[in-house]
Amino acid sequence: MDKRHDPSRRIIAPTGTKLSCKSWLTEAPMRMLMNNLHPDVAERPEDLVVYGGIGRAARDWECYDKIVEVLQRLEDDETLLVQSGKPVGVFKTHSNAPRVIIANSNLVPHWANWEHFNELDKKGLAMYGQMTAGSWIYIGSQGIVQGTYETFVAMAKQHFGGSSKGKWILTGGLGGMGGAQPLAGTMAGYSVLTCEVDETRIDFRLRTRYVDKKATTLDEALAMIDEANASGKPVSVGLLANAADVFAELVERGITPDVVTDQTSAHDPLNGYLPQGWTLEQAAQMRKTDEAAVVKAAKQSMAVQVKAMLALQAAGSATTDYGNNIRQMAFEEGVENAFDFPGFVPAYVRPLFCEGIGPFRWAALSGDPEDIYKTDAKVKELIPDNPHLHNWLDMARERIAFQGLPSRICWVGLKDRARLALAFNEMVNNGELSAPVVIGRDHLDSGSVASPNRETESMLDGSDAVSDWPLMNALLNTASGATWVSLHHGGGVGMGFSQHSGVVIVADGTDDAAARLGRVLWNDPATGVMRHADAGYDIAKDCAKEQGLDLPMLEK
């Protein structure tokens, strides 16, 4: 019997102001853990899988129950340690220490590969935490919508003279991360064709308004795209098909999309990518009987897809890797020029990282959408001169369906995170908000990740693989008083290819919270500016000087 599987479980986080724990500092991690497993949030909540192949919130159901039990009894001078989804210890600390410290799927580098991890996973000794699955701050597909939107807007500026009118995107994957692409694309003015092998995922994205239409043949999907481009009204289409088949077929037909990318779970060839010609049922069975054959077949199909992406790039498509390590998988299968198209971070996002700008997010523990709308208004009030940001907030309110607890993603940087957080804390204090909010971010941020095939690809000084930075980020956030801090391995791109840290802090309206918020939400993005300044980026050096960062080796 698999201790991770229980179809009878239906987890819904409590809402309102009644506490199940001894304070908001422990109530918040409990609610956010539960929210990660909400049926509208998680991909396979009955298996504790939140997103990204096998990204879990807890190691098994026994561990989940024990985490909740401990959080409900935890005092405000105690810290719970969670090791790969298992609560292993409670220790006396102090009131400004984190209430929870999490480490997920970390392996000594020589053994940091899927084969070793999968053996540990089978024995119940490890858990893959992805990025925000095991750190309890996943907010559904909204969590990546704005970053994807910003990337697509940047692509329009770089490749199409600033206009996406009549342009269309080809991509793959409608899981927890990939599901953001169709909505982000149409928000940015493109039509989007997304290939997905699991019809239930297409239906889920239709229900939550991330996808506009479903197609079962390529001809049907292309007709929908053509009609939308002719009418000037962008459309997103979920096509029930294997991405490798479709990408290769478009090359064969001589059809060239304007933008090509992919967000299948290629980072995990065993669990995340369906080989060409296989059914979902066949793959599920083969994973039990012949893992090596599944991995081999999946990587061969990825090689087909990447070859097609390279061919489409040569035909004129703006082509980018959206951070799932598909280029690496294809390279290992003999596609020697797999890295001829760039990753999205060095191509489009790094200038933002240089100013500490990244995926700042918050969730309303009240469960009341009005609390989010009030914070949206506060962001506009405090950042009045950023029409692009205002436009994002307006579109998000109009077009993004909340999944689980109401939440918002908003890319802001060093200059703004702490002051927004302090304003939210004051809104809790004066009763404008009906309950506290939690403030966190993705691990995909400027100072919190080392990932040579994604966030730290092609660093100016060649320091792509140096992972001191996310370790220092986690330690500094712990010292600064975050409510929970996490340190993970393998998120986004798979085992052996990344290390990264997460941070979440509660704004409960108290003066103590204000002090912690001021420290954490200044120091956290400041580490991103520091990391990029150290690598030699002028934008980061200028930002560090403007903001008065004390970086001893930076020339004054």
Swiss-Prot record:
SUPFAM superfamilies: Urocanase. NAD(+) binds at residues 52-53, 130, 176-178, 196, 201, 242-243, 263-267, 273-274, 322, 492. Keywords: Cytoplasm, Histidine metabolism, Lyase, NAD. Its main location: cytoplasm. Pathway: Amino-acid degradation; L-histidine degradation into L-glutamate; N-formimidoyl-L-glutamate from L-histidine: step 2/3. InterPro entries: Urocanase (IPR055351), Urocanase-like (IPR023637), Urocanase_C (IPR035401), Urocanase_central_sf (IPR038364), Urocanase_CS (IPR023636), Urocanase_N (IPR035400), Urocanase_Rossmann-like (IPR035085), Urocanase_sf (IPR036190). It is found in: Cytoplasm. One of its GO terms (molecular function) is urocanate hydratase activity. One of its GO terms (cellular component) is cytoplasm. Its cofactor is NAD(+). It comes from the Bacteria. Disulfide bonds: none annotated. GO terms for biological process: L-histidine catabolic process to glutamate and formamide; L-histidine catabolic process to glutamate and formate. Catalyzes the conversion of urocanate to 4-imidazolone-5-propionate. This is Urocanate hydratase.
